[in-house]
């Protein structure tokens, strides 16, 4: 149990997808204007990561891993296309659920919801799972923790950006300029966790 708690804390704070690996920055910067929208996207990313990492773990271990289907069969060359296909299917299902049950959130996320399919944070989580050889339970914990970490980062940035609307930002830095600086300072803050050994 201790190992899983350690993995969860590490994936949220120490190995934060957005602020340590800088994955998913396109949606991270574009959607972080309002806390409510950022929280909705963060929940969507967390759900997709929590489901796609373990599902891709099963697909990898049962079909793609060298020797999974037979002693001399190696299908690892299909990793990328298979992982992206599984992620795309899960995002499509999530999109249909949001459209049916949460129309305001679906409309607020707009084009960024289908972009979760190609969000490198999602694919990065799946790739790290394969690279680190996580088992199924570790994949569930890692996927959930990575999603929560990404959501924490985007909601924090959105909160700061909402407060900056009322600040006197120099004209040359308004918009994405000050957002990049803010994200960089947040990343420095998360770097303080890098020395923590769990």
From Swiss-Prot:
UniProt keyword terms in alphabetical order: Cell inner membrane, Cell membrane, Ion transport, Membrane, NAD, Sodium, Sodium transport, Translocase, Transmembrane, Transmembrane helix, Transport, Ubiquinone
Name the InterPro entries for this protein: NqrDE/RnfAE, NqrDE/RnfAE_oxidrdctase, NqrE
Q: Report the membrane topology from the UniProt record.
A: Multi-pass membrane protein
Query: Membrane-spanning residues where?
Result: 11-31, 39-59, 77-97, 110-130, 140-160, 176-196
Q: Which GO terms describe its molecular function?
A: oxidoreductase activity, acting on NAD(P)H, quinone or similar compound as acceptor
Sorted alphabetically, the Gene Ontology cellular component annotations on this record are: Gram-negative-bacterium-type cell wall; plasma membrane
Stated role: NQR complex catalyzes the reduction of ubiquinone-1 to ubiquinol by two successive reactions, coupled with the transport of Na(+) ions from the cytoplasm to the periplasm. NqrA to NqrE are probably involved in the second step, the conversion of ubisemiquinone to ubiquinol.
The subunit field of the Swiss-Prot or TrEMBL record says: Composed of six subunits; NqrA, NqrB, NqrC, NqrD, NqrE and NqrF.
Q: What is this protein called?
A: Na(+)-translocating NADH-quinone reductase subunit E
Q: Which organism is it from?
A: Vibrio anguillarum (Listonella anguillarum)
Q: Could you tell me the gene encoding this protein? A: nqrE
């Amino acid at each position: 149990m201790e190992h899983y708690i350690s993995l969860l804390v590490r994936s949220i704070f120490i190995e934060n997808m957005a602020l340590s690996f800088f994955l998913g920055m396109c949606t991270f910067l574009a959607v972080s204007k309002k806390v409510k929208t950022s929280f909705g996207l963060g929940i969507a990313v967390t759900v997709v990561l929590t489901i796609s990492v373990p599902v891709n773990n099963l697909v990898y271990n049962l079909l793609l891993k060298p020797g999974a289907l037979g002693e001399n069969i190696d299908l690892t060359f299909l990793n990328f296309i298979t992982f992206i296909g599984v992620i795309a299917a899960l995002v499509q299902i999530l999109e249909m659920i949001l459209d049916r049950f949460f129309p305001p959130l679906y409309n607020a996320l707009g084009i960024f919801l289908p972009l979760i399919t190609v969000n490198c944070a999602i694919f990065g989580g799946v790739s790290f799972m394969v690279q680190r050889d996580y088992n199924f339970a570790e994949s569930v914990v890692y996927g959930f923790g990575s999603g929560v970490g990404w959501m924490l980062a985007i909601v924090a940035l959105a909160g700061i950006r909402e407060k900056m609307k009322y600040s006197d930002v120099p004209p040359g830095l308004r918009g994405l300029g000050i957002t990049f600086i803010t994200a960089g300072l947040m990343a420095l803050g998360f770097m303080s966790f890098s020395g923590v050994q769990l």
